[in-house]
Amino acid sequence: LICSLEKFSGCENGKTIIIGAGKLGMALLEYSGFEEYGCTVSAAFDKKVTEPIKLDSGKVIYPMEDLSRFCRDNDIKIGIIAVPADAAQTVLNILCENGIKNIWTFAPVKLYKPADVLIRYENLALSLAHLKSQIIE
């Protein structure tokens, strides 16, 4: 069913990258459940990385300088933003400059985007607070 929906929607290519290789970015990079839904997390990028780092899983964390080439060579469609709020707008701008129009962000900040870019905001603290407000005792 998932394959049929992907083909119907034209979204067979779920090639994804992560920007930010801190704790959250690494957890997302190593999570294997995305592939079940047609998304392949290809790599991560981080400003603190100066040389590519290959993980035991085979995935690689690259320096930010490699982002443009990687996006061009790998037909990346989705970008995940896992950076602090003060860096998120810059990261979004870089992703947009590289043709990535589908964004999933964990940064707790409103981002300004071109009209043809889709952003899905994920606020983990807000989700937990919402659950807390509905505690059943």
Specify the residue positions occupied by each region the protein language model found.
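Hydrophobic, well-ordered beta-alpha structural blocks that scaffold small-molecule cofactor pockets
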Residues: 1-98, 106, 114-137
